[in-house]
Amino acid sequence: MSSEHVEFTKDNIDLYLKEVAKEYRKQVGKGMPAELILIGGASVLVNYGFRNMTTDVDALIHAASGMKDAINRVGDRFGLPNGWLNADFKNTASYTPKLDEVSVYYKTYSNVLTVRTVAAEYLIAMKLHSGRQYKSDLSDVLGILAEHGKRGTPITMEQIQKAVTDLYGGWTSLSDMSQAFISNVMEDGRFEQLYAQIVQG
């Protein structure tokens, strides 16, 4: 089955993570706890309601070697593509070990697998740092800003600047394009309308 035909949603990510935890526990027992930190599209899915799916699950994986087998077995059982849950993100410019420190607790499965996520201004900082002008990266930034506004916990430019500095050492680590994009949308403030324009465009 090719990855084009697999869509990960909040519900099925939960199911697959539960199965991975069970499989991992079967292999290594209770004494070897593991941790996954969801990033990218998967982190958007579990923290926010504006996005329906992603095509793979990116994570930082802290676990015994049995985790790889557990992931592959669950993938085989559900007909998921190789690499459906992967740590390839570690090879990108957006990776920094500081993501561990800023991640927030999400859920524990089978008393052995703790799942954390990167959210709010830190997820925005990662999206901006990747510098990709992909529709989904730009719409994710706007969706996160819009949803925090609706929740009554708006994210400020100062918080975003601090997050970029915490993770990547300074504002100038962002491309000129990313700096201009976030400055313009924060000045504009109509996050929902801008989100709709990008998604429809």
Question: Language-model segments: what does each one mean?
Answer:
Residues 1-201:
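Compositionally biased terminal segments of proteins
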